[in-house]
């Protein structure tokens, strides 16, 4: 399909309905059903291991091997379910999901079907524009991950590949799959999906149950999209597509937006939307057809015969609940009140994804406004240029130290930016950067000498200020700052000049 209708035109006649499946790899030491090291776990060295080295007979589905349940993975799943506002099941019951694919060595996946670990949850989602939606969560169930295929082609994709290799290091990694109920967010649907996944990432990081690196596949999202003609009955859900394995927040939003446009184009031209899986091509900004989407009965679920139901005591659930940190949504509300931020100010922090950094900077001694200024401004700008996370550039303690030096009059904003750059670029401490580049403000005696000289050499400008044209003071301030190499407080200089030239 070469051309699709615009997003605005698609929304005129159709209401988008989305459903989200978010797969979260748990960061346990070992896999879900075996003692093999977890490639998504806390040991960074695992990620650099060669293919098919983190496996056991259980991971490979060898005859005679039997699974045993990782209790820590169950605890992590319960904690995540509670954080999603879900009820927790009384028993842990596994089922076999039967299908054939090369990355599934047993030809079935141990998952859950009728009795998920957690169910009936809800998350509050707020978009950048301040619109609030409630995404209902149908279930969050525990399952094992599949292996990973490496397609040998110029693009790394299966299309045109001469052959594919299989790495079973990921096989058996514990997953929680979070399944939403249909979301009706109209034109905000792509944004709501992105913010929903972003909030889940924030939750799992606060709980410490996942590394939550989307680019490494620790969190993957499948986005179901269908369009309903406006005015059609609310109970009717048309054919849907499922765009698989979206692994960036940007891709989630763009893929859903494109799929809405693509389906609207098909329906408007009299064609049917095929119920299928699709794959997102980030480089082209389009989705491509995958395979016909299977219904649940085609997986022939049945109870896992090698794992008996495991009771989940209520006191265990309560103990996990009491051990959980403050929920990110509660944290947001508390910090907004403590910092006395307006809705716009706080949304700026959230949209820049630096809430944790601002909080830690404030706790290190900076003012909320000062911490926000640096993290949402200069640091975010540098991170955007370098395509990295702001948190990877500088510590909150260093930012707090810079802000404190500004408040003490040792640095001004211009010098502070130079200090910041040196700390980031050269891994210096704040004090090392100041000493290396002589970046502290000039002493007051030197400032006074420069001020006297500037006033005596600019009598015409001085007379303008005296006559009431106070905007001319900017010329005098600029001359002083130039003579001092920027090492002065411009606002204090301005006030000093006005106090000296104007009658009180």
Curated annotation (Swiss-Prot):
<dbReference type="InterPro" id="IPR004413">
    <property type="entry name" value="GatB"/>
</dbReference>
<protein>
    <recommendedName>
        <fullName>Aspartyl/glutamyl-tRNA(Asn/Gln) amidotransferase subunit B</fullName>
        <ecNumber>6.3.5.-</ecNumber>
    </recommendedName>
</protein>
<dbReference type="InterPro" id="IPR014746">
    <property type="entry name" value="Gln_synth/guanido_kin_cat_dom"/>
</dbReference>
<dbReference type="InterPro" id="IPR017959">
    <property type="entry name" value="Asn/Gln-tRNA_amidoTrfase_suB/E"/>
</dbReference>
<dbReference type="GO" id="GO:0050566">
    <property type="term" value="F:asparaginyl-tRNA synthase (glutamine-hydrolyzing) activity"/>
</dbReference>
<keyword id="KW-0067">ATP-binding</keyword>
<dbReference type="Pfam" id="PF02637">
    <property type="entry name" value="GatB_Yqey"/>
</dbReference>
<dbReference type="GO" id="GO:0006412">
    <property type="term" value="P:translation"/>
</dbReference>
<dbReference type="InterPro" id="IPR006075">
    <property type="entry name" value="Asn/Gln-tRNA_Trfase_suB/E_cat"/>
</dbReference>
<dbReference type="InterPro" id="IPR017958">
    <property type="entry name" value="Gln-tRNA_amidoTrfase_suB_CS"/>
</dbReference>
<dbReference type="InterPro" id="IPR023168">
    <property type="entry name" value="GatB_Yqey_C_2"/>
</dbReference>
<dbReference type="GO" id="GO:0005524">
    <property type="term" value="F:ATP binding"/>
</dbReference>
<keyword id="KW-0547">Nucleotide-binding</keyword>
<dbReference type="Pfam" id="PF02934">
    <property type="entry name" value="GatB_N"/>
</dbReference>
<comment type="function">
    <text>Allows the formation of correctly charged Asn-tRNA(Asn) or Gln-tRNA(Gln) through the transamidation of misacylated Asp-tRNA(Asn) or Glu-tRNA(Gln) in organisms which lack either or both of asparaginyl-tRNA or glutaminyl-tRNA synthetases. The reaction takes place in the presence of glutamine and ATP through an activated phospho-Asp-tRNA(Asn) or phospho-Glu-tRNA(Gln).</text>
</comment>
<dbReference type="InterPro" id="IPR018027">
    <property type="entry name" value="Asn/Gln_amidotransferase"/>
</dbReference>
<dbReference type="GO" id="GO:0070681">
    <property type="term" value="P:glutaminyl-tRNAGln biosynthesis via transamidation"/>
</dbReference>
<keyword id="KW-0648">Protein biosynthesis</keyword>
<comment type="similarity">
    <text>Belongs to the GatB/GatE family. GatB subfamily.</text>
</comment>
<comment type="subunit">
    <text>Heterotrimer of A, B and C subunits.</text>
</comment>
<keyword id="KW-0436">Ligase</keyword>
<dbReference type="InterPro" id="IPR003789">
    <property type="entry name" value="Asn/Gln_tRNA_amidoTrase-B-like"/>
</dbReference>
<dbReference type="GO" id="GO:0050567">
    <property type="term" value="F:glutaminyl-tRNA synthase (glutamine-hydrolyzing) activity"/>
</dbReference>
